[in-house]
Amino acid sequence: MKKLIFLIVIALVLSACNSNSSHAKELNDLEKKYNAHIGVYALDTKSGKEVKFNSDKRFAYASTSKAINSAILLEQVPYNKLNKKVHINKDDIVAYSPILEKYVGKDITLKALIEASMTYSDNTANNKIIKEIGGIKKVKQRLKELGDKVTNPVRYEIELNYYSPKSKKDTSTPAAFGKTLNKLIANGKLSKENKKFLLDLMLNNKSGDTLIKDGVPKDYKVADKSGQAITYASRNDVAFVYPKGQSEPIVLVIFTNKDNKSDKPNDKLISETAKSVMKEF
């Protein structure tokens, strides 16, 4: 009996190793194909299975942080209080604010701020959300409370999008970011109403159609938030992926970049990475 158990354990270990080496080889090949760097962290919240690739390497998180900021604000504000209004001044407006630029001199609700940030990736909306939380220091404090001492918010929009590989400013690792997303949104303190509100925004978001959504089976549901920094071809997507018939998501973080500051990203890199990683689940 002991020998049988030993053989079963060995078989499981070898199977896991083969699985890991399989996706690692495919992702290494993708890095060569696109002359890029890939970082991946995936967590099946149902089984606890993880898939990692360069998961402790730092990348610019760019606009994917809007999901975290929105979730932190939604922890603080009950759903029936999201009608609170904030005033928008001309000086508040930064580049790429397609919704908030229409509100100069007017008031906007917290609910509409989150909708603008998550659905249109409105940069001014993200800044206002951070300020409603209490500023960048409060965001960092909440991250530390969640056990995340890696994700490093320093700047507001749009400066946070100027990534430098020599700096840790506004960067994270796929593993740290993915675990924080899980603790904040999938298994966090959000009320039922606020969680549904945020995930519905991510599910109906169209900006990620060429990213993780493009790499998973069409009958999967994908609630995502994409991001793209201005430098080093930094292109990201973070998502809660729901396989058909599964109510507990797979948290999937894909961060990518390149070596040259002026390089341009390719969305196919992320969709092909997602396709490779999801074979493991």
Curated annotation (Swiss-Prot):
GO terms for biological process: beta-lactam antibiotic catabolic process; response to antibiotic. This is Beta-lactamase. The class A beta-lactamase family has a specific amino-acid numbering system, sometimes called Ambler or ABL numbering and often misspelt as Amber. A multiple sequence alignment was used to derive a consensus sequence and then the consensus was numbered taking into account insertions and deletions. This allows use of identical numbers, e.g. for active site residues, despite differences in protein length. UniProt always uses natural numbering of residues, hence there appear to be differences in numbering between this entry and some papers. One of its GO terms (molecular function) is beta-lactamase activity. The gene is blaZ. Substrate binds at residues 225-227. InterPro entries: Beta-lactam/transpept-like (IPR012338), Beta-lactam_cat (IPR045155), Beta-lactam_class-A (IPR000871), Beta-lactam_class-A_AS (IPR023650), Membr_lipoprot_lipid_attach_CS (IPR012640). PANTHER family: BETA-LACTAMASE, BETA-LACTAMASE-TYPE TRANSPEPTIDASE FOLD CONTAINING PROTEIN. It holds the Pfam family LPAM_1. Keywords: Antibiotic resistance, Hydrolase, Plasmid, Signal, Transposable element. Belongs to the class-A beta-lactamase family. It comes from the Bacteria. It catalyses: a beta-lactam + H2O = a substituted beta-amino acid. It is an enzyme of class 3 (hydrolase). The active site is at residue 63. Its EC number is 3.5.2.6. Residues 1-24 form the signal peptide. It comes from Staphylococcus aureus.
